[in-house]
Amino acid sequence: MGVFNYEAETPSVIPAARLFKAFILDGDKLLPKVAPEAVSSVENIEGNGGPGTIKKITFPEGSPFKYVKERVDEVDRVNFKYSFSVIEGGAVGDALEKVCNEIKIVAAPDGGSILKISNKFHTKGDHEINAEQIKIEKEKAVGLLKAVESYLLAHSDAYN
């Protein structure tokens, strides 16, 4: 088994606390609303949203994958940090054992924020992660962030 790390940062004009509330704490409801082309539904299969919770994210028809199951590993409301692992579905299977993700939202000097993402791909056997796979996953994450950002800009009273 190998572990391949990937880190990225994406700026946002939305303040960290507001972005964390919308994107992380209420993302299960908000993402299918603002990005239905990317997320059809999110349901809690087990747990209350805190560590140990298992969520099933279903993707729209025509997506490369039907669904993923994620386990919530950490929700830090003070430091705006969220960690979760993809444990089933999606790319997890023959080549990947799991994908561990950490999202941290930090304040930016301009009043906005910076979304810091860390991914650890745990491969099976001697499988490797190629750069194209990582690029696709980053583009998806940025797309979701921008959809939430657009919603928040259009709804200035939401998630304050």
From Swiss-Prot:
GO terms for cellular component: cytoplasm; nucleus. This is Major pollen allergen Aln g 1. Coiled coil: none annotated. Keywords: Allergen, Pathogenesis-related protein, Plant defense. Belongs to the BetVI family. Signal peptide: none annotated. It comes from the Eukaryota. The keyword Cytoplasm does not apply. CDD domains: Bet_v1-like (cd07816). GO terms for biological process: abscisic acid-activated signaling pathway; defense response. It comes from Alnus glutinosa (European alder). One of its GO terms (molecular function) is signaling receptor activity.
